[in-house]
Regions:
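Single conserved hydrophobic/aromatic residue that forms the stacking wall/gate
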Residues: 2-9, 13, 270-279
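Soluble, acidic/polar mature domains that operate outside membranes
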Residues: 7-40, 115-147
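Exported/periplasmic cell-wall-interacting domains
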Residues: 74-75, 187-188, 202-273, 277
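Extended, domain-scale alpha-helical bundle/helix-rich regions
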Residues: 75, 82-86, 90-103, 110-111
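Cell wall/extracellular polymer interaction/catalysis modules
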Residues: 105-185
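Gly/Pro-biased beta-strand-loop elements
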Residues: 148-235
Length: 279
């Protein structure tokens, strides 16, 4: 009957109208997404994410819903990370003795939190605004300049068996130390490490030792700086045959001064270089 036909036709028209409305809505949504600009502030540089890149991530499914390619967003974040992350990347250090060394190991440095940054981009796209911000970091460093470590760090020179503690560019203290016993295969590894935590009155234990210390400052697993009052001499060649299990053994007064100055996250730059003494 004609009635059935007209009813079917009106369903089709209704469907078309709904689709048109949905289509217009999804076009609006896409325009809003493409109008988003995120300017990343890296201090020494800025990176801009805008519609040109964003449009590559957008598509519409069969039900006319906007789909964002999260893999595409993630690969953008990975590009940012490979450009601006500095953890595990080589660092040049002009040593306190004047020479320049490369420290090529260690977790210290900027590190973008990829999954959280993807989530933040998706939120920014939904909001459709122009924003300027830092990326979401899993880990931060002192500086975005040429050297990410800035001017606050402990410089631990394994060759000279001497360390320097700098805070805001000022030398707070320096001291001889004894590091890991080279002859027994306990040489202290070089690298850029953060202080994991610090604690008073710890007992350090290993398979064949138990050492009570007053100031314990680990930075690389169970390797750290601490006082060792049973040692009467520090520096020189002691470490080669009578060194520690890997830790940086310090005179009590130096350990105390360092402990009072540094906190969790403070940087230790450990390197091997020619032991030319200052002066």
């Amino acid at each position: 009957s004609t009635h059935c036909i007209s009813s079917a036709a009106s369903d089709v028209y209704k469907r078309q109208e709904d689709d048109n409305e949905k289509l217009l809505a999804v076009i609006d949504e896409m325009n809003s997404y493409v109008g988003t600009t995120i300017t990343y502030d890296f201090d020494v540089a800025k990176e801009v994410l805008d519609g040109e890149r964003i449009s590559e991530w957008l598509s519409v499914d069969d039900d006319l819903n906007l789909v964002v390619d999260e893999e595409g967003v993630l690969s953008f974040v990975k590009e940012l990370a490979s450009e601006y992350n500095t953890c595990y990347k080589p660092k040049e250090l002009k040593t306190s003795y004047g020479s320049t060394v490369t420290i090529s190991n260690g977790p210290y440095g900027w590190k973008i939190n990829n999954s959280e940054e993807v989530a933040q981009i998706l939120d920014d796209l939904k909001a459709g605004k122009k924003v300027e911000r830092e990326p979401v970091y899993a880990q931060t460093a002192n500086s975005h300049g040429e050297n990410d470590y800035g001017n606050s760090y402990v410089e631990i020179n394994l060759t000279a068996q001497h360390l320097f503690l700098y805070k805001d560019g000022v030398l707070v203290t320096e001291s001889d130390f004894v590091s890991g016993n080279v002859a027994k295969g306990h040489a202290t590894p070089g690298g850029a490490f953060m202080l994991t935590y610090k604690t008073l009155n710890a007992v350090l234990r290993g398979p064949d030792y138990e050492t009570p210390v007053t100031y314990w400052m680990p930075f690389n697993g169970d390797i750290g700086m601490h006082d060792l009052t049973s040692r009467k001499a520090f520096g020189g060649d002691i470490y080669k045959t009578r060194g520690s299990h890997g830790c940086i053994n310090l005179p009590y007064s130096a350990a105390k001064k360092i402990y009072e100055t540094i906190d969790k996250g403070y940087l230790s730059l450990i390197h091997i270089s020619e032991p030319t003494r200052l002066g």
